[in-house]
UniProtKB/Swiss-Prot annotation:
Protein name stated in the entry: Eisosome protein 1
Cellular component terms per the entry's GO annotation: plasma membrane
InterPro entries, sorted: Eisosome1
Chain coiled-coil ranges: none
Length: 930
């Protein structure tokens, strides 16, 4: 709903009447129709001048009906400056008004009637007054004195009212509206200090109750006259007049004469008062003056008949006011109309955008549902394909293992025979050595007995000689004992320190014992590990040493060379794909820019046509500029929208990479097959190539994201959603249903999952020829497919440091090549399965959202699958064995139909291999890949 309804929609017959005219006038409208009641209400609400019964807001004029005329007059004057406030009331006005109002009527009459003369005849005025007769003299009519007390009282009341209004102005409560907040900000800011100073309605009511208390009238009156001085209120003129009056009274000789004079004067004054009303209308001069004045006033009134007094001597007719008002208000009303039309257009656009958003949201939900169904189908297909490949590989590995065991058993028998011969010779040699040792022992015992007897005789003679020589030394020993006692006391003092040191040593010993226990525990663990290792290498030490030191290294070198050549070929292939995708994206972006320019040109021409007031575009000119009419261009553009959305929609699903399954059991082989340490460099190179492929695919997809055509009218969804979010709207027509086999048999062109329409392969597919319609190969068992082995070139083996770095990337601890080979041979000897080769998956570039290609790449042979003769050939510089391997990869294309029977089916846990060994790790692998 717009803010202001159109004035044309309301049939309002109200009209305004001015003083002196009865006709209905056009209130600020060119077409003669007045404004609607809603428009007037909105305008009053916007500017805060709406008068409600609950709040009386004055317009500043006595007659509120003249407010519009005064506003028009002020607008005509166009006063851009506001004069500063000036105090028009004199500070002595209230004092003068009080003094005048206090004067009585009698004092003023007496003072006016009393005339003091200084002539020489004043002394005998009383005698003449008694003797003379009253003579009637013609008295000229005088104007009656104006009663100034009423005028001054009114002026004082008006002044007090104006002062009260200025001191306590009326508070204006603005009506809430869109502009009320801005107007309040422009006028003033209601800070907390100002809000505290403002009085509320309750404050005013409390003050009124206090003022209305009759007990406080006397105190208020006394407070009002606290500064009043009656002596200052009398004027100097009155004081001088009273002094002269008293001096005149003092000159009179008799009070009787004064009383008689007063009586005569009063009689004359009464006669004048009685005669004035009768002579007023009979006086001819008065009548002439009245007629002249009436004619003059009538002439002045006739000059401004039918005009409006604008104040300040300005009189305008109703037509002039209408012209001024139309010149000022019409642009505002036109702007209101234009904004109302714009608001209606915006409301309509919002409504249409909501409809478009709902449709696009429904399409996006449908797209997500199809994505989930495709994920289920792809996971089931991948699981079945892995099962087929694993069964064939297991059979071949068992056959090779049996042959290897037969050959190695014969070699072990020969080595055991040689070992028995060596043991026999060792026993004979040991017997001979025991006889020689017995003879030597008897000879040594005889020599020792003779030597012992001779030494005893020499010892007796030496003892006698020693006693004689030691006698002087005995005395020295006694002296030393005395010294020893002295040192004993010193030793006791040192023992205390020693005890303290021993306590510290004991604490260190406790810590040493703890460390010894830890060392013993670690030694026990080490011995346990050594026992396990010796158990594995008990009977086959010489054979394992030969394999680990010579044959394993040679086989690993050959494998590294083969893998390197394969990765180089893949790198070349990916570089070619990246170049093709880059050129395709540049071509698409150029076509998109051309369409945008054409579309902007059509938009500009349409705007020019609307401004000119024409209904249709100049199709001849449009055809001359862009080569086709506007309808043809729009139809072609809409057609290209669907094609571009289907063709360049990014496909982010990848098959299982080597990195994601290399540590999972139960995927390629049963019985817990483990990854060999010599395959780690191959995994690293495969991971690097997959990362390079992902980055290349992302670069080629980025221009395709922006390939959606520029819409003729911007949408709210385009402004809110990200640029790469362009959901495909599903067409209403139901497509023809196809099975994956039927789609693959239709010439190798993938069918769309949405519409079922065959789409031509992309430029990359045409150039490289990747898609091959080989549907028969998919129905064959997996055992028919032989593992691919790339040609190996004779190069230097990878350095040990690189191998160590690749082994360090694996999460599990990898033992040296020697221990690994021993462990695998021990498993083979115990009847376990041979370690299965690890498959490597390469993600092909996505062609369509519903089409994917799962490419099974090179299968790497294991150490157990290489014959000894082949290893000697590789060591001598010969070519790597290629028997049993093919030099090509197979590409399987799967298509998704709309009527797939297993869209909502969950993976069946009853399939073969699902509940076997490593089933839980298969589930985790499924979550990681999809």
């Amino acid at each position: 709903m717009s803010l202001i309804s159109a004035a044309a929609d309301v049939n309002d017959a109200s009209s305004t009447t001015s003083a002196g005219s009865v006709r209905s006038s056009a209130v600020y409208r060119k077409d003669g129709k007045p404004l609607s009641q809603e428009a007037l209400y909105r305008a009053q609400q916007k500017y805060g001048v709406f008068q409600s019964p609950a709040r009386q807001t004055g317009s500043g004029l006595k007659d509120s009906k003249m407010a519009s005329d005064v506003a028009a007059n002020l607008a005509n004057n166009n006063r851009t400056t506001i004069e500063a406030y000036k105090r028009v009331l004199d500070s002595n006005a209230s004092r003068a008004a009080t003094a005048v109002s206090s004067r009585s009527r009698s004092s003023s009459v007496t003072s006016n009637a009393t005339v003091v003369t200084t002539s020489s005849k004043s002394t005998n005025a009383a005698v003449k007054a008694l003797s003379s007769k009253p003579v009637e003299q013609p008295v000229a009519p005088k104007k009656s004195n104006m009663n100034m007390s009423k005028i001054l009282v009114g002026a004082e009341a008006a002044a007090e009212k104006r002062i009260g209004i200025r001191m306590k102005p009326e508070k204006i409560v603005y009506v809430p509206s869109k502009e009320s907040g801005k107007a309040a900000e422009r006028s003033m800011s209601l800070t907390p200090e100002i809000m505290d100073k403002l009085k509320t309605k309750g404050d005013y009511e409390a003050e009124a109750e206090v003022e209305a208390d009759p007990k406080k009238y006397a105190s208020k009156a006394a407070f009002a006259v606290r500064d009043f001085d009656p002596n200052e209120a009398t004027e100097k003129e009155l004081l001088e007049r009273e002094k002269k009056k008293q001096a005149y009274f003092g000159m009179l000789t008799s009070p009787q004469v004064l009383s008689l004079a007063r009586a005569n004067a009063q009689v004359k004054l009464d006669q004048i008062d009685k005669a004035a009303p009768g002579s007023l209308y009979k006086n001819e001069e008065f009548n002439k003056l009245a007629v002249a004045l009436a004619q003059k006033n009538s002439t002045k009134r006739s000059e401004h008949h039918g005009k409006i007094n604008m104040g300040g001597g300005l009189w305008l007719t109703q037509a002039d006011v209408q012209n001024i008002a139309q010149g000022l208000i019409t642009p505002v009303l036109d702007e209101v109309d234009s904004r109302a039309l714009q608001q209606r257009a915006i409301d309509e656009d919002i409504k249409q955008r909501k409809i478009d958003f709902k449709e696009q949201n429904a399409a996006w939900i449908e797209l997500q549902r199809n994505k989930l169904s495709n994920d289920k189908m792809y996971s089931r297909e991948t699981r079945m394909r892995h099962k087929r490949e694993t069964e064939g590989l297991h059979a071949r590995t068992e056959r090779k293992f049996q042959d290897l065991c037969a050959s190695k058993d014969s070699e072990v028998a020969e080595m055991e025979k040689a070992l028995q011969n060596a043991k026999d010779s060792y026993a004979a040699l040991q017997k001979q050595m025991e006889e020689d040792l017995e003879k030597e022992r008897l000879r040594v015992e005889a020599e020792v007995a003779a030597l012992k007897k001779e030494q005893e005789e020499d010892l007796k003679a030496a003892r006698v000689e020693q006693e004689q020589e030691l006698k002087p030394y005995v005395d020295d020993v006694k002296a030393a004992e005395a010294e020893h006692e002295r040192l004993t006391a010193e030793r006791d003092s040192l023992n205390k320190e020693i005890e303290e040191l021993r306590a510290s040593i004991e604490s260190h010993k406790v810590r040493i014992e703890e460390l010894d226990n830890e060392i013993s525990d670690s030694a026990a663990k080490h011995e346990e590990e050594e026992g396990k290792r010796e158990e594995l290498t008990k009977h086959k030490e010489e054979f394992d040493q030969e394999v680990s030191e010579k044959f394993t290294v040679i086989a690993q070198a050959a494998k590294e060379k083969a893998q390197k050549s394969s990765e180089e070929a893949r790198l070349k292939q990916l570089e070619v794909d990246a170049m093709i995708n880059e050129r395709q994206s540049e071509l698409n972006s150029t076509e998109l820019e051309l369409k945008k320019e054409k579309l902007s040109l059509l938009e500009a021409m349409r705007n020019v046509t609307e401004l000119k007031g024409e209904d249709k575009l100049d199709e001849n000119r449009v055809k001359a500029l862009i080569g086709m009419t506007s309808e043809e261009f729009i139809a072609e553009n809409n057609k290209s929208v669907n094609v571009s959305d289907d063709k360049f929609e990014p496909f982010n699903e990848h098959t299982a990479s080597t990195k994601s399954i290399k540590h999972e059991e139960g995927v390629l082989g049963e019985g817990g097959a483990k990854t060999n340490s010599d395959e780690l460099p191959v995994k690293d190179s495969a991971e690097k190539s997959s990362e390079h492929l992902n980055s290349t695919a992302e670069k080629s997809i980025e221009p395709a994201k922006a390939s959606s055509p520029y819409p003729a009218k911007p949408s709210m969804v385009d402004a809110v959603l990200p640029k790469d979010f362009k959901p495909e709207v599903k067409p209403k027509a139901k497509p023809a249903h196809k099975t994956p086999q039927q789609g693959a048999a239709a010439g190798g062109e993938p069918a769309s999952a949405k519409s079922g329409v065959k789409r031509s392969p992309s430029l990359k597919q045409k150039f490289m020829g990747i898609i091959k319609g080989d549907t028969k190969s998919q129905s064959k068992p997996a055992a028919a497919a032989t593992p691919v082995h790339p040609p190996a070139t004779v190069k230097k083996a990878a350095p040990k440091k690189a191998a160590a770095s690749s082994e360090a990337d694996t999460p599990a601890k990898v033992s040296p090549a020697k221990d690994t080979a021993k462990t695998e041979i021990q498993k083979i000897a115990q009847g376990g399965p041979a370690p299965a080769p690890e498959p490597e998956h390469k993600t092909a570039p996505a062609v369509d959202n519903a089409t994917t290609k799962s490419v099974s790449t090179l299968q790497k042979p294991t150490n157990s699958g290489i014959d000894k003769s082949e290893i000697h050939k590789i060591a001598q510089g010969g070519p790597a064995p290629t028997s049993g391997h093919s030099n090509h990869t197979r590409t399987s294309v799967y298509e998704n139909g709309d009527n797939s029977d297993d869209e909502d089916e969950l993976p069946d846990s009853s399939e073969a291999g699902e509940n076997g060994i490593g089933a839980d790790k298969k589930g985790s692998l499924f979550k990681e890949v999809f």
